[in-house]
């Protein structure tokens, strides 16, 4: 079998064009790039269907570079999830500055929707089941934290109104549960505006269907 030199050159050129060019980066820049690529892949395909090889290929580096930064796929996934959890929790925590109960709850809801809007891949990632080896940093654990915070807010409001504060956890579960489901729905439709969604969700839980 005779292979012409011109054919070999053409094939090599084609393969070179298909590979993303390797850009020289600092260690921190490369790490940030790998995290962003992995976040997109994990959000689209989940943990099991994402490979270190594909992350490396999209970044234009070899697999050892990924292992050098994260130790493996599990380590990479843990870093990505931890960053998304931190981003969401920071947004929620910073919204808890209003001393009035209802506006404070509404700003928490709006903070979640803002995260969904600005970090869509991150939210999709958090909604996916984490591998068994990574027990922390799951969306369910975040929801539990949110229930605890909202329960504390509602308990204070119930006491002020002369209502039984022991019922606050029940209402907190209902509020956070409805907000969580609505956020997952809004993730795809993006209508109406997040401010309108937040206002209606809080009004529904605060006043019921009569208002």
Model segments located where?
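Helix-turn-helix
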Residues: 33, 37, 41-75, 79
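Short, structured helix-loop boundary elements
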Residues: 31-32, 52, 74, 78, ...
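N-terminal intrinsically disordered/low-complexity leader segments
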Residues: 1-29, 158, 165
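Short secondary-structure transition hinges
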Residues: 75, 107, 114-152, 159-165, ...
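Hydrophobic alpha-helical connector segments
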Residues: 79, 93-118, 172, 198
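Amphipathic C-terminal alpha-helical segment
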Residues: 115-118, 152, 156, 172-192, ...
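Amphipathic alpha-helical packing segments from all-alpha helical-bundle domains
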Residues: 86-89, 135-160, 169-173, 196-199, ...
């Amino acid at each position: 079998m005779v292979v012409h030199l011109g054919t070999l050159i053409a094939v090599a050129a084609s393969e070179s064009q298909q590979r993303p060019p390797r850009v020289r980066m600092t260690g921190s820049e490369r790490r940030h790039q790998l995290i962003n690529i992995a976040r997109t892949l994990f959000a689209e395909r989940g943990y099991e269907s994402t490979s270190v090889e594909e992350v490396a290929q999209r970044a234009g580096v070899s697999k050892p570079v990924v292992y050098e930064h994260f130790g493996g796929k599990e380590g990479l996934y843990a870093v990505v999830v931890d960053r998304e959890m931190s981003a969401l929790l920071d947004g929620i925590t910073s919204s808890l500055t209003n001393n009035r109960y209802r506006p404070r709850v509404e700003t928490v809801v709006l903070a979640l929707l803002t995260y969904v809007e600005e970090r869509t891949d991150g939210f999709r990632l958090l909604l996916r089941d984490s591998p068994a080896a990574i027990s922390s940093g799951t969306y369910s654990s975040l929801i539990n934290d949110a229930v605890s915070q909202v329960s504390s807010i509602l308990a204070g409001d119930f006491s002020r109104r002369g209502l039984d504060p022991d019922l606050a956890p029940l209402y907190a579960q209902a509020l956070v549960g409805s907000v969580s489901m609505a956020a997952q729905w809004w993730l795809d439709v993006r209508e109406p505006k997040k401010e309108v969604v937040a206002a209606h969700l809080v009004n529904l839980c605060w006043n019921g269907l009569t208002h």
